[in-house]
């Protein structure tokens, strides 16, 4: 319990330090929120400590560099009676450029022995960067080519899709039309069947022979077709008899009798078919 109260006090102090004169946002104070804010305050404290140490180290190095620079200036004055302040504007620019180059190249001093390796390393980095750029350019060219092909393919697919949709609409309209025609034909067929049944009932009521009904006439028509099929061999056989020379008169009589019998059958069936159509 004491540990929790200590953490709450530390969190409150940290929030007051963070927000300063601004009001601290309201939040629910419980063990969970206190633990989270306590961990944040600890991380913030550690970060501030690290920043402080780095800052102090940089300040110390700056003092050391200033001391070293003053020592070198004094050494120059004592040895050759030279001071950077005595340089011309051009000399000052050259000196500043030399110093800036040393800083950029991260050399330990401005001697030629330090500059040459640094420049060589920079040149190597430049070549590696150029090589990498060339690889990236080639990769980009491949990607652009693939992208172009993909776009062309996408356009073709879109056109094919439009054609397919148009064809589908046309086929759908055709199917709908056929369905409507089929429904119409079914209705008409049912109407005709009903009319035939009604007519047959009326004719039957009037004493019509059942053999003249629609079904009977259809059966007779089928029977006529079967008789015609069966008489075909007889006709062929009869034709072969016509070529025979003995007793032509008797043969002619038989032929005429067969023709009359066949004509009678065909006439009777034709009459019944015509009555069916009426």
From Swiss-Prot:
The keyword Cytoplasm applies. The gene is HAUS1. It comes from the Eukaryota. Keywords: Cell cycle, Cell division, Coiled coil, Cytoplasm, Cytoskeleton, Microtubule, Mitosis. Belongs to the HAUS1 family. This is HAUS augmin-like complex subunit 1. One of its GO terms (cellular component) is mitotic spindle microtubule. Component of the HAUS augmin-like complex. The complex interacts with the gamma-tubulin ring complex and this interaction is required for spindle assembly. Associates with microtubules. The interaction with microtubules is strong during mitosis, while it is weak or absent during interphase. It is unclear whether this interaction is direct or indirect. Interacts with EML3 (phosphorylated form). The keyword Cell division applies. Residues 53-81, 124-152, 183-277 form a coiled coil. Contributes to mitotic spindle assembly, maintenance of centrosome integrity and completion of cytokinesis as part of the HAUS augmin-like complex. One of its GO terms (biological process) is spindle assembly. The lineage of its organism: Eukaryota, Metazoa, Chordata, Craniata, Vertebrata. It is found in: Cytoplasm; Cytoplasm, Cytoskeleton, Microtubule organizing center, Centrosome; Cytoplasm, Cytoskeleton, Spindle; Cytoplasm, Cytoskeleton, Spindle pole.
